[in-house]
Amino acid sequence: MRRFTESYLARTREGMWAGGEREALADLELASADRVLDVGCGSGEFTAVLAEESPGRVVGADRDPDLLAAADCEGVRADAHALPFPDDTFDVVACQALLVNLPDPARALREFVRVARPGGRVAAVEPDNAAVSVESSVGAEAALAQRARDLYVAGAATDVALGGVRDLFDAVGLADVTVRRYEQTLTVEPPYAEEDVRAVARKAKAADLRERRGVLANGGASEAELDELRRAWREMGREAVRQVGEGSYRRRETVPFYVTVGRV
């Protein structure tokens, strides 16, 4: 399973469920849940949403102690494949962007089912990273982002384009399965946040491509193709830096998430 930093989680989950737009979570029936578990909670962004929507006890579980320490919630150090809770404990067991990072998501779901009470709900909020779209004031950015994304999806060790997981829910015996789509929008525009300025500076260095080079190679790119992609990415990044300097850079990224809910 990939490991993430607190800053990465804060950046990638910025704006998720903001503004009270939480209709996609309706099937979790959080208003009637007394005990809720967020598995793979990280630094607690989704846990906080669950706590806002539920009147009951909300617990976050993650195997990374540093992320748990940053989460403003009741936290338990735990592996998603071996949750330290008795059978039939929770009314709702949920996760966000966890199954896409697991080599065997069905194994984790079976644990979710075990610790959920009969009649309780299991939910997974998972992205389809293959369907992410980018709009940018830098002309080359959208096409380059798509090229890098295609290679990343093809080369990743897990199914990062998992999205809706109805088949997995059916396979572990969950009933009344529903799937709702929710879109997360990440916007960069003036006045720029410090994190956005740093992210643009990373583009000019092609830092993300360097860190993911092995995965991109696994996706089918040759060394020459990766070198050319890096060259074009740095050129795009320098133009983005220039636009930030004059206050004209704008970027909009839309990530489709699918909220799959089933009943135990």
Predicted regions, residues:
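Conserved Class I S-adenosyl-L-methionine
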Residues: 178-264
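Conserved catalytic/acceptor-binding region of the Class I
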Residues: 127-206
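Conserved class I S-adenosyl-L-methionine
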Residues: 1-34, 45-46, 67
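A short glycine-rich, Lys/Arg-flanked "PGG" loop and its adjoining helix->strand segment in the class I
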Residues: 106-121
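Class I SAM-dependent methyltransferase SAM/SAH-binding core
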Residues: 35-37, 42-82
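A short acidic, Gly/Pro-enriched loop at the edge of an enzyme's catalytic core
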Residues: 81-92
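A short SAM/SAH-binding and catalytic strip from SAM-dependent methyltransferases
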Residues: 91-106
